[in-house]
Amino acid sequence: MGAGDKTAAGMPRIGMGTAVQGPKADPIRRAVLRAIQIGYRHFDTAAHYETEAPIGEAAAEAVRSGAVASRDELFITSKLWCSDAHRDRVVPALRQTLRNLQMEYVDLYLVHWPVSMKPGRFKAPFTAEDFVPFDMRAVWEAMEECHRLGLAKAIGVANFSCKKLETLLSFATIPPTVNQVEVNPVWQQRKLREFCRGKGIQLCAYSPLGAKGTHWGSDAVMDAGVLQEIAASRGKSVAQVCLRWVYEQGDCLIVKSFDEARMRENLDVDGWELTEEERRRIAEIPQRKINLGKRYVSEHGPYKSLEELWDGEI
């Protein structure tokens, strides 16, 4: 397993995430450039992360320096933010993303959440008045237009339940290529993975280590006793055990570290595999979702409960 290992659709199995608190352009640019030099080829961003511009600068610098022969060697994912999840705002939003990236296309464009907000609502905290009903069909038709225009080589979604995917597939003329969701040993997504596999949708795991250090993250993954025991017995880090487990499920994974040693470690999970006994022990870890998406729930909004947001799949 390495940064160059790809899915059947050509998506590198390991991507570098860039969702950081209070993003600062220069450290991100330097980290992305170093990641390219180390071997990463997939970079995950979003309009909401405000990291598109430094990724674009790093990509251009990598081409100039010869670290990659051309932009085509990189796989760039970005996402449509909720305030642009309206039929007439999707294509303009992607065009702005491309200006930020200084690129002619993204490899993958995702609907960030199955949520719509009033235009201009970008930063939390959000109020009940910010939310409007999510017109899935209208938004997806505009996503399909992004693909037809050549602005996005592939389109997909993030944070969609089985039920929402079923609805989307009932009318999509271009089905989603990817569903990017939280996946880790504490939230294993067995039902969703099986559903996606049956529909030809690639599952992509964010927060495979539990997103410790983020506003919603948890120590639950890295502190799990089972994972610590397996790591100690195999001479691996807990992170390597987690990433290997996600990889063995057939998922793509997004890892985030700007520390070079960790960047290298996150790529280096090849040449070994978990035993059947280790897989069984991981399968028995009590399950709980970490990223609940509480900020998108309001008693006066379209989603009045977490049950409604996730269609009971929590």
UniProtKB/Swiss-Prot annotation:
SUPFAM superfamilies: NAD(P)-linked oxidoreductase
Pfam families: Aldo_ket_red
Site (Lowers pKa of active site Tyr): 79
GO biological process terms held by the UniProt record: response to iron ion starvation; siderophore biosynthetic process
E.C. code: 1.1.1.285
Gene3D superfamilies: NADP-dependent oxidoreductase domain
Record's keyword annotation contains Transcription: no
Annotated NADP(+) binding sites: 44, 158-159, 180, 258-266, 273-281
Region (Disordered), start-end ranges: 1-22
Reaction catalyzed: 2'-deoxymugineate + NAD(+) = 3''-deamino-3''-oxonicotianamine + NADH + H(+); 2'-deoxymugineate + NADP(+) = 3''-deamino-3''-oxonicotianamine + NADPH + H(+)
Pathway in which the depicted protein is active: Siderophore biosynthesis
Active site: 49 (proton donor)
Enzyme class: oxidoreductase
A GO-annotated cellular component: cytosol
Chain sites annotated for binding substrate: 112
Tissue specificity note: Mostly expressed in root tissues, observed in mesocotyl and embryonic roots, seedling roots, crown and seedling leafes, mature bracts, anthers, pistil, caryopsis and embryos.
MF (Gene Ontology): 3''-deamino-3''-oxonicotianamine reductase activity; aldose reductase (NADPH) activity
Keyword Chloroplast: no
Keywords from the named record: Iron, NADP, Oxidoreductase
PROSITE patterns in the cross-refs: ALDOKETO_REDUCTASE_1, ALDOKETO_REDUCTASE_3
Family to which the UniProt record says this protein belongs: Belongs to the aldo/keto reductase family.
Biological role stated in the UniProt entry: Catalyzes the reduction of a 3''-keto intermediate during the biosynthesis of 2'-deoxymugineic acid (DMA) from L-Met. Involved in the formation of phytosiderophores (MAs) belonging to the mugineic acid family and required to acquire iron.
Protein name according to UniProt: Deoxymugineic acid synthase 1-B
UniProt organism field: Triticum aestivum
Organism lineage string: Eukaryota, Viridiplantae, Streptophyta, Embryophyta, Tracheophyta
